[in-house]
């Protein structure tokens, strides 16, 4: 618990006190935000606001994670490093997108196709590493089961019994599944990052959930020798859950400090550099804690935001009419007359409620297992 609190404290301190320096630096080198021309007119004043603040979040989170472990003499575990791999990898994709926007002086960076391809180049190696990297007992960090609050009976490895074709099919399905989780997550967070502080505040709740989940899984881990006899049937086969909890806490703290400068009116924006990184970290945590489907609840706001875009496009293509005044959903409410800060705070409340529901479902699964 002390390591978790330290990680939060380090994260807050780093971003709270260093972000002003990066605001000045990014403004000086011309890393300014470009606003979509078809967006709400009141967003035009945000043009030129320093962007790529996600760099601050990523660096602060990683430093805070290592410092928290170092101060308490804890070993950095492969589970945390795997999350960092996805965190940094997706951040680099976002950084490339942001750099292209700055150089082209346009709100369009990487095209959708190239963005998904690059995201897949991060997600697929991550999926392979979760099996290739094993703990001290020789157990991989992931399984081929689809998970909710723990692994379910849906297991791609059941295809192994079909011989070489079955083994090949199982691996392809597993890689596609992990890629779907990762790509969906990073793009959902990116879609949500359209108002000052919205994505950062919502992700704080998601990271809080993974702090709680990782800490609980650590106490109820199957590898613990001191586990009460009555809890053995409920234990979690998760590698390094406490380490992931510490990393989630570091990200949470970094977001809290960053939000001080990112809230309306924003002095700096995280850009795709931050949004893709956060989506990648959340996806990695859901995979490594075996809570893949539960992530749909924990990140419910991101699901709604991404879903509003999908619905808008599909409905318009079929009926030539729009469901919303504008998608994503937060822009719809802006055009309905809601103030930006009103939309953000109400969406934060929704994100918090989804997180509470998700943690409740997680605990209920343990209670009734």
Curated annotation (Swiss-Prot):
Organism classification: Bacteria, Bacillati, Actinomycetota, Actinomycetes, Micrococcales
Key words, A-Z: Cell cycle, Cell division, Cell membrane, Cell shape, Cell wall biogenesis/degradation, Magnesium, Membrane, Metal-binding, Peptidoglycan synthesis, Transferase, Transmembrane, Transmembrane helix
One Pfam family in the UniProt entry: Glycos_transf_4
InterPro entries: Glycosyl_transferase_4, PNAcMuramoyl-5peptid_Trfase, PNAcMuramoyl-5peptid_Trfase_CS
Main function: Catalyzes the initial step of the lipid cycle reactions in the biosynthesis of the cell wall peptidoglycan: transfers peptidoglycan precursor phospho-MurNAc-pentapeptide from UDP-MurNAc-pentapeptide onto the lipid carrier undecaprenyl phosphate, yielding undecaprenyl-pyrophosphoryl-MurNAc-pentapeptide, known as lipid I.
Family, similarity comment: Belongs to the glycosyltransferase 4 family. MraY subfamily.
PROSITE patterns, per the entry: MRAY_1 (PS01347), MRAY_2 (PS01348)
Cofactor section: Mg(2+)
Gene Ontology, cellular component aspect: plasma membrane
Name of the molecule in the record: Phospho-N-acetylmuramoyl-pentapeptide-transferase
Its membrane topology: Multi-pass membrane protein
Reaction catalysis annotation: UDP-N-acetyl-alpha-D-muramoyl-L-alanyl-gamma-D-glutamyl-meso-2,6-diaminopimeloyl-D-alanyl-D-alanine + di-trans,octa-cis-undecaprenyl phosphate = di-trans,octa-cis-undecaprenyl diphospho-N-acetyl-alpha-D-muramoyl-L-alanyl-D-glutamyl-meso-2,6-diaminopimeloyl-D-alanyl-D-alanine + UMP
């Amino acid at each position: 618990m002390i390591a978790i609190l330290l990680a939060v404290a380090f994260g807050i301190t780093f971003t709270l006190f260093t972000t002003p320096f990066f605001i000045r630096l990014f403004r000086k080198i011309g890393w300014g935000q470009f606003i979509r021309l078809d967006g709400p007119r009141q967003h035009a004043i945000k043009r030129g606001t320093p962007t790529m603040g996600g760099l601050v979040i990523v660096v602060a989170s990683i430093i805070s994670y290592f410092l928290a472990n170092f101060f308490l003499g804890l070993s950095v575990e492969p589970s945390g490093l795997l999350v960092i791999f996805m965190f940094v990898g997706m951040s680099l994709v976002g950084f490339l997108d942001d750099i292209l926007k700055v150089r082209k002086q346009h709100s369009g960076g990487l095209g959708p196709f190239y963005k998904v391809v690059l995201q897949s180049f991060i997600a697929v190696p991550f999926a392979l590493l979760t099996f290739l990297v094993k703990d001290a007992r020789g157990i991989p960090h992931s399984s081929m089961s689809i998970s909710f609050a723990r692994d379910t009976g849906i297991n791609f490895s059941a295809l192994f019994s079909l011989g070489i074709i079955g083994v090949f099919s199982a691996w392809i399905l597993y890689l596609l599944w992990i890629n779907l989780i990762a790509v969906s997550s990073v793009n959902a967070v990116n879609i949500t990052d359209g108002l000052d502080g919205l994505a950062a505040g919502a992700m704080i709740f998601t990271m809080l959930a993974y702090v709680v989940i990782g800490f609980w899984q650590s106490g109820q881990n199957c590898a613990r020798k001191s586990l009460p006899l009555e809890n053995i049937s409920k234990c979690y086969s998760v590698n390094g859950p406490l380490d992931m909890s510490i990393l989630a806490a570091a990200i949470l703290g970094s977001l809290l400090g960053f939000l001080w400068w990112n809230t309306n009116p924003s002095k700096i924006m995280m850009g795709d550099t931050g949004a893709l990184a956060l989506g990648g970290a959340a996806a990695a945590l859901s995979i490594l804690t075996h809570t893949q489907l539960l992530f749909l609840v924990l990140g419910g706001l991101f699901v709604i935001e991404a879903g509003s875009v999908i619905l808008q496009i599909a409905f318009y293509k079929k009926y030539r009419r729009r469901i919303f005044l504008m998608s994503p959903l937060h822009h719809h409410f802006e055009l309905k007359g809601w103030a930006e800060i009103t939309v953000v705070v109400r969406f934060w409340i929704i994100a918090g409620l989804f997180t509470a529901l998700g943690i409740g479902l997680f605990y209920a699964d343990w209670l009734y297992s």
